[in-house]
Amino acid sequence: MQNLLAFTLKRLVALILVVWAITTITFFLTRLSPYDPIRPLLGQKLASNPQEYYALRHLFGLDQPLWRQYLTYLAGLPHLDLGYSEESSTLGRPVWELLQVGVPVSLTLGAYSLLLALLVGLPVGLLSALKKNSLLDHGSQTIMMIVYTIPPFVLAPVAQLVVGVELKWLPVSGWGDPGIAGIREMIMPVVLFAAGLAGFFAKSFRSFLLEVLQEDFIRTARAKGLKERVVIYLHAGKNTLIPLASIVGPTMAFLVVGAFIIENFFGIPGIGNITVSAVTQSDYPVIQATTILLATAVVFINFLTDVFYALVDPRVRI
């Protein structure tokens, strides 16, 4: 237990250092840019009203030395003070208010997509492993390979054109409407988001299960006369947990990248959409906040994965 606690503390310290490094790099990359976010806000009024220009710079703290801006930003992070939006349509709004709208939407999209991917990918991977080299195995693996390798930015417009425009089965955009309309809006983005993940899970689970089924303890269990269902679900299934945990990192990366693509194609007001909008409008405080938020989420999930590894496999703690 002491080894586990020491391992967890070391990983926690590493997590904090990584988040601090990401925060620092993101801050200085945006602040050292030659672009002045205040000038586009005033436009032609800048020449006739320079006082407003300096007032806005003071409001956003841009008139302070860079080191003081950095320390002020770090001091505000524990209080969720992420600065104020510099984009004209949301000028002066706290960045955290914008994130409070986008985070639940992205979490909902990601959770439903992940659940659907698990419900499809794991059973397909299981059947493929149990029916190795059969027609079912080859067919399912081919389909999973296709949906895994085709990127969402290719699938999304094709699905919108065919399913939404030509067949008119589902809406091509929107999110959050009440009742049946809201459910119909969710179907296409969730299915497209889950498709690649399902293929990834199916291929990974099949590979892990086939490897475990070759182990000596599986042969011993079968030699003892245990039912095949018990061997598969109890002995083999339990031992696929560790290798399955190894794909959490790639899964998180896929979720982050997929959210950017799917949310923008379907007009979903999540973190991905907010980030892309901030980049196109050069809204640096929002870019900083979303970058730090997404990076922290990925690093934290990897931290939990490391702790899980150490919990189920004591050799990792050494």
Roles of regions detected by a PLM:
Residues M1-L4, L62-L122:
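An internal, D/E-rich "acidic patch" concept
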Residues Q2-A6, L99, V103-L136, P152, ...:
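Alpha-helical transmembrane segments of integral membrane proteins
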Residues V18, K131-P152:
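Small-residue-rich alpha-helical segments with characteristic i,i+4
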Residues I22, T26-T30, A156, Q160-G164, ...:
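Juxtamembrane/transmembrane-helix interface segments of polytopic membrane transporters
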Residues L9-L15:
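N-terminal signal-anchor/signal peptide hydrophobic helix marking the start
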Residues V19-L71, L167-E185:
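Hydrophobic alpha-helical transmembrane segments of membrane transport/permease proteins
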Residues A14, I22, K45-L46, L116-A117, ...:
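Transmembrane alpha-helical core residues of multi-pass small-molecule transporters
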Residues I25-L32, G61, Y73-A75, T142-P171, ...:
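Membrane-water interface segments at the C-terminal ends of transmembrane alpha-helices
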